[in-house]
Amino acid sequence: MTRVHVPIHLRWADLDAYDHVNNVEVLRLLEEARVRAFWRGEDDGVDAGLALIDASAGASTMTLIARQEVEYLLPISYGRRPLDVQVWLGRLGGSSFEACYELRSPAGVEPAALYARASTTIVLVDAATGRPRRITEDERAAWAEYVEEPVAFSRRG
């Protein structure tokens, strides 16, 4: 299956007093990767295969986050090269889907590091009614190539 690779630059402000990226900032980095992967916009060099959702003002579909989970594996130090956030779909439901992520060291860096893995359940909502809307057959067909096993969290307790 296919994963979308989204390069995400760290900001100096992402660091906390322990000189690594703060856990809340990791969620913001994942949000940035999610927006670039799923919402239609300008061509920024990211595979647009997942980008089917119109996020412009007045769009007919809104998205709501129903659930998020992050497993932090290694501290992330500041670096100038963008991290490689790999995004795929772990599940396609009726009106929701699970976006999965691996937050990795910059492409080409050896040894490669896996800093975090995460998942987000996203619900598609009809903007006019405020009610969940079904994933269309066109969306389902386009997204099928990006579906693989969901994140296997190892530190549940």
Predicted features along the sequence, with ranges:
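Hot-dog-fold acyl-thioester-processing enzymes
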Residues: 1-65, 127-157
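Generic structural detector for well-ordered beta-strands
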Residues: 7-11, 71, 121
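HotDog/MaoC-like acyl-thioester-processing domains
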Residues: 1, 77-81, 88-157
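Hydrophobic beta-strand-centered segment that forms part of the acyl-chain substrate-binding groove
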Residues: 37-97, 113-115
